[in-house]
């Protein structure tokens, strides 16, 4: 079965715990990985989700195309508009011993107490084709520079804005059994298309970094 969504929702392209709603977290705030590599986790776009079984193995694929500019990506006024390109990505969750109990997957705890050990192994990847935010979940606003937004310029076309491509890959492992819950997450990020980039519009201050990770 397939489910299609269009609008603003939790994106599947982040680490697993960023799929949890705030009221379903195990602790009072999100973990450091989520805080450093995501913002709200909500994006605007088209989302396709499915789930099926291969024998006793559960498979849950998800795909997404978003604006690449995070929540409220159309901006609050004419000076706060979308910039850069779209973000493309997806997620694949595998349940080797079958799905968790209904309603127990996207919880930080094992509130429903899985009677047998249940495991989720997940991976996600996304490519933001023109990012203007440090984690690819926001868009440039000169009033929000201290919140991670930025604007680069092309050295070959003076005054023309230039945005790097931002790649993010995640790996997740979740185990739940009789009230015990364990989550391991890994993330790797990199930025590309940073050659011939300037930090100011008259191209006198050059960016000397070719990869950020």
Where are these regions (language model features)?
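Outer membrane beta-barrel
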Residues: 1-71, 79-98, 117, 125-127, ...
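A short secondary-structure junction signal
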Residues: 60-62, 72-78, 102-104, 133-137
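Detector for outer-membrane/organellar transmembrane beta-barrel domains
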Residues: 93-96, 100-213
